[in-house]
């Protein structure tokens, strides 16, 4: 029987229509499969093959990764993926995984994505034999929460490639092991792959993690793309693969201090004054760069931030990092002038290119007092 192919809207574009914050039900009741949330976590890989899932366009998806594998390497990538499953499923999963590899550039195993909502639940809702293991599960769910993660269904939290796991099988196995482990065990995870539970003691770490550890001679961009496509390494960024992402809040203080010091150095603002009446132009409203907007408001400035990704801009606005969001340059210019004249502390988001914004400022004879950029460009070749 032919399964429905995974398809995208157009080439590589996605519908970003989604309410970022939605009502969550903290439940331990039954899901579609008749299992409770706790039972799902305890079961790990399901005993029956779940139905194939098409790509869900209610969330943003990772861009297609480069095709870097030879035909023999593609076979190896599929073999690496099939090791998580019983042999009776291999004839069904092998062509499906090949399709994901050729269409998406990586095997994510979308079929095994859970039906339950993923978000950081109250800790007592997690099945566990020790509080620290439940805490790790909570942290993983925070990293994969669709209102937080950049590409949640590809298990990427931020930075374009900051992965929690390489595929959904690894997630399911990790949840099962964490649900069952005790304080005399340690879970070892290598680039998303749960190696297993090992005897330890209560004073040892509950989880030992490594991500992307390779020797320098084999650490080029191409080496990474190849090993990632094979399913043998991942880039965890700083806090994605270590399960502790907190978004912009971790850098707001440093960004605020940097902005204040720039004004003191270049605009000769004294140490007792805020940045009232100062116009600060920058770009980037990604997972971390939302800190710029909040820092500008804390410092008392008027900030205009350009962001080409409408989904990222909307998310930062709805989360409260950004004061206002505009799609029209004319309205941005009018609002900025008004805010500067009134000495407001406000961040004004513009969905568009920073070059267009700068050109509009020139055309309207507006000279920014300070300029910066935080478009990190983690995936410059995608």
Task: Describe every region a protein language model picked out.
Residues 164, 282-283:
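A generic secondary-structure micro-motif detector
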Residues 347-375, 379:
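Active-site/ligand-binding-proximal alpha/beta "capping" segment
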Residues 5-254, 260-267, 271-272:
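N-terminal ligand-binding/catalytic initiation module
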Residues 171-176, 192-195, 288-291, 354-361:
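Short alpha-helical segments and helix-capping/turn motifs at coil-helix boundaries
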Residues 180-185, 300-301, 367:
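Structural alpha-beta junctions
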Residues 237-260, 264, 271, 276-279, ...:
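Catalytic or ion-translocation cores adjacent to nucleophile or general acid/base/metal-coordination motifs
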Residues 186-191, 209, 282, 305-306, ...:
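General beta-strand structural signal in soluble alpha/beta enzymes
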């Amino acid at each position: 029987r032919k399964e429905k192919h995974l398809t995208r809207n157009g080439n590589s574009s996605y519908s970003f229509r989604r309410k970022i914050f939605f009502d969550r039900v903290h439940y331990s009741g039954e899901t579609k499969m008749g299992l409770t949330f706790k039972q799902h976590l305890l079961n790990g890989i399901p005993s029956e093959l779940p139905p194939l899932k098409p790509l869900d366009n209610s969330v943003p998806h990772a861009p297609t990764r480069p095709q870097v594998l030879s035909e023999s390497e593609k076979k190896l990538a599929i073999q690496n993926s099939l090791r998580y499953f019983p042999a009776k499923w291999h004839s069904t999963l092998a062509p499906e995984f090949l399709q994901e590899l050729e269409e998406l550039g990586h095997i994510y195993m979308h079929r095994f994505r859970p039906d339950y909502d993923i978000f950081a639940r109250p800790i007592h809702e997690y099945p566990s034999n020790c509080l620290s293991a439940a805490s790790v599960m909570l942290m993983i769910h925070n990293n994969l929460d669709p209102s937080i993660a950049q590409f949640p269904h590809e298990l990427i939290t931020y930075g374009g490639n900051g992965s929690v796991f390489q595929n959904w099988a690894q997630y399911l196995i990790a949840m099962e092991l964490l649900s069952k482990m005790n304080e005399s065990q340690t879970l070892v995870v290598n680039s998303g792959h749960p190696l297993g539970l090992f005897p330890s003691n209560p004073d040892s770490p509950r989880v030992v993690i490594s991500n992307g550890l390779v020797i320098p001679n084999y650490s080029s961009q191409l080496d990474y793309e190849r090993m990632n496509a094979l399913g043998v390494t991942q880039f965890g960024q700083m806090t994605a693969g270590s399960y502790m992402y907190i978004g912009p809040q971790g850098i707001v203080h440093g960004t605020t201090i940097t902005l204040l010091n720039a004004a003191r150095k270049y605009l000769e603002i004294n140490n007792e004054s805020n940045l009232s009446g100062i116009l600060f132009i920058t770009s980037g409203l990604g997972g971390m760069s939302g800190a710029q907007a909040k820092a500008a408001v804390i410092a008392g400035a008027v900030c205009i931030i350009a962001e080409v990704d409408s989904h990222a801009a909307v998310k930062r606005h709805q989360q409260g990092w950004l004061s206002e969001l505009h799609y029209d340059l004319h309205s941005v210019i009018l609002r900025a002038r008004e805010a500067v004249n009134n000495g407001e502390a406000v961040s004004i988001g513009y969905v568009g290119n920073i070059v267009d914004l700068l050109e509009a400022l020139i055309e309207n004879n507006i000279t920014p007092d300070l300029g910066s950029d935080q478009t990190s460009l983690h995936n410059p070749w995608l």
